[in-house]
Amino acid sequence: MQRGKISFGKIKLNVNVPPAEPRSNETEAEDAKESTEASGNGGGFKKMDKEQMIRQIEDVAEDLESQHLKEVMGISGFGRKAAKVFDINEQIEKARVTRPGMDKKREESKPKEDDQKDEEEEDVIGPLPPAVTTDKEKATKESSKDEDSDDDDYSSDEDSDDEQSLAKRIPYTHEVQMQHGSRAVLALAGDPSGARLVSGSIDYDMCFWDFAGMDSSMRSFRQLQPCENHPIRSLQYSVTGDMILVISGNAQAKVLDRDGFEKLECCKGDQYISDMSRTKGHVAQLTSGCWHPFNREQFLTAALDGTLRIWQGLKSKEQLQVIKTRAQGGLRTNAASCNFNRDATLIAAGCVDGSIQTWDTRKMFVNTTHCVRDAHQKGSEITSIVFSYMGQQLATRSNDETMKLWDLRQFKQPLHTWTNLFSRYDTTDCCFSPDDRLLVTGESLPKGQAEANLYFYSTKSYEEVQRIPVSNAHVVKTLWHPKLNQLFVSCGNGTIKCYYDEHRSIRGAKLCVVKTHRKRQPMEMVGVSQIITPHALPLFRQEKSRTSRKRMEKARMDPVKSQRPDLPITSGQGGRVASSGGTLSSYVIRNLGLSKRVDDDQDPREAILKYAKDAAENPYWIAPAYKQTQPKAIFSEKLPADEPATKKPKTEADK
């Protein structure tokens, strides 16, 4: 039984012939005539009219043109897609041969490249040979036995392998030294992007280091004293890296921008108010401070007034919250260090009495969330308190020569305590490695020791992984930058050392080492001799060519050329003062004393004799006054030469 093909899109079932329509007798006769003509021609060509020939030629031309256009444009056709044509007989035969589920087995048993060939040649594929499965099972059994037998060996060697891998992770193959000054560097901070570094010392100076702009000489591009005569205790970049928090020995913290210009200075509290929560700021020396982990306008400060204060905003300059630290008896104790955890849900403070106190930022700061009273020796400052990057561990460094590691889930006892870590400065700190597998701290130089060391401890096995000798001075600050993978260590002699790995570290100090320092060429000293040219003399000097506007301005300034009129008569300075003056004293002085001045070069005798004849003829001052009493002038007699100029006056006794 032969079935016709089904075409989808326009579904037609044996519709090659259109449906029968009622025909007239005339149409039937014409069809019969055409069939007889076709049979008579023996299957030859039909006779076409001229119009039919032209239509077919145009159709063929259009088909060729459209096919060429499809090839150029890279498309399959215009308009609707052609309907696919399926053969029903072929589909039925395939359905009989293939059973449900056989295709999946074929795909699993053979690769995809041979599936097409196998489906055409073979209909059924048998199961895989059993030898393959038995080999796999044997291999898996043997491997499992080997793993079980080697478990003990691996467990014994795990610690040594971890220590070796941790030692390789420390970037200290190369070393670069930067000179800050001659005094101890107490503060060290790095930009979050790793482009810059800032340092502060006990000699009040703060230096800015730019790795992209420095050469092998490693000189800072800016040095300033932001807090005048106060040592810099702590520095920290904000989360965005555009501001720097400066904690000094003053009671007021400062915020600087990246270039060192002051943006904010905190308020100072009233020291005569006993309740510290009612003051607007700290009233004693600052000890520590840090930025909020993700809020760029919020930071935390701690001081010796027994409070921690949270500051919000750069414009308001007002504190947001006040946290009081309490000792065991309820008395006030001072916080020596403070810090936020990574998600800013906890604030931790290391106090002078050796206690560790934490507060939840989502609650009121009345009671502590965690409080460990005997965390360190009483009376020794906790110089550093640092959260791990994961936020589950806490490390503290104290002046009691110990460093402790704590777990926040079990906060009563420390996980481990490292001893014999001498620290002389109250800013000595510790830090975690970027993967939280190492804990790093430095020591001050003890007596009888040549060099101070930098220690690396494992946070899992608590063993010493590496010890690096730094210098013959105290090690104060340590900074392990997570992006640069470089270690920065500040020392007590004013130097900052940078350790990096040639392969594991990126940018930072590696950019400066490759740049050679260009020395300035010494300038030759040439004796300066005076050269006089004719054009320099006033006689031969020519005026410079100027524009008409400048010439007019200069002429306007000249009172002669501009024909300035006389200034008004005033008694003040700058005007044409009246000849008689504005007051009686000025009138007397000008008319009687200074109106007729006597020159120093003139002979006074000649000046007087000039008026002698006039005075004798027309006496006005002296002659009329003595005319009645002494009409004849009496002059002094000439004394003999032997007599002294002054004689002793005669008395009545002598007479």
Swiss-Prot record:
It holds the Pfam family WD40. WD repeats lie at residues 180-219, 227-268, 281-321, 330-369, 377-416, 422-467, 470-510. Residues 1-54, 83-165, 544-580, 633-655 are annotated as: Disordered. The keyword Repeat applies. PROSITE patterns: WD_REPEATS_1, WD_REPEATS_2, WD_REPEATS_REGION. One of its GO terms (cellular component) is nucleus. Keywords: Repeat, WD repeat. Residues 147-164 have a biased composition (Acidic residues). It comes from the Eukaryota. Coiled coil: none annotated. InterPro entries: WD40/YVTN_repeat-like_dom_sf, WD40_repeat_CS, WD40_repeat_dom_sf, WD40_rpt, WD_repeat_GAD-1. Residues 23-36, 91-115, 134-146, 554-564, 639-655 have a biased composition (Basic and acidic residues). Belongs to the WD repeat GAD-1 family. This is Gastrulation defective protein 1 homolog. It comes from Drosophila melanogaster.
